[in-house]
Amino acid sequence: MSVFYPIHCTDYLRSAEMTEVIMNTQPMDEIGLSPRKDSYQIFPDPSDFERCCKLKDRLPSIVVEPTEGDVESGELRWPPEEFVVDEDKEGSCDQTKKENEQ
C-alpha cells in the first residue's frame, strides 16, 4: 500500500512552469530576422565598420602641449608642492639639528 502526499515545494512548481514555457516557445527556425534595425545590435554591421574607417582617415590629430600653469582638478603630481623643500631650507634644518644635538 502506498500513500502519495501532495508536493508543496515552490521550487518544483517553478520548474514545472519553466518546462511549460520551454515546451510552448517557437522553434528557432520559425523566428525570422526582421529587415529593420532594432534599437540594439549584438554584432556591428560590416557596412558601419567600413563607413567608420573612411571617417577615421579624415580626422585630424590633436596635439596638446603640457603647460607649467596650475594643476587641473583630478591631476596628481609627485611630489606634492607642499612637500618640495628648497636646498637652502634643507641646509638650515641640518644646522639646527646639529646645534640641538650639542
UniProtKB/Swiss-Prot annotation:
PANTHER family with a match to the protein in the record: PROTEIN LBH, PROTEIN LBH-RELATED
Protein name as annotated: Protein LBH
Gene Ontology process terms (BP): regulation of DNA-templated transcription
Function: Transcriptional activator.
Swiss-Prot/TrEMBL keywords: Cytoplasm, Nucleus, Transcription, Transcription regulation
InterPro entries on file: LBH, LBH_dom, LBH_dom_prot
Keyword Transmembrane: no
Organism of this sequence: Xenopus tropicalis (Western clawed frog)
Source superkingdom: Eukaryota
Similarity annotation: Belongs to the LBH family.
Domain named LBH: residues: 18-101
Residue ranges, compositional bias (Basic and acidic residues): 90-102
Annotated spans, Disordered: 66-102
Annotated GO CC locations: cytoplasm; nucleus
Subcellular location(s) per record: Nucleus; Cytoplasm
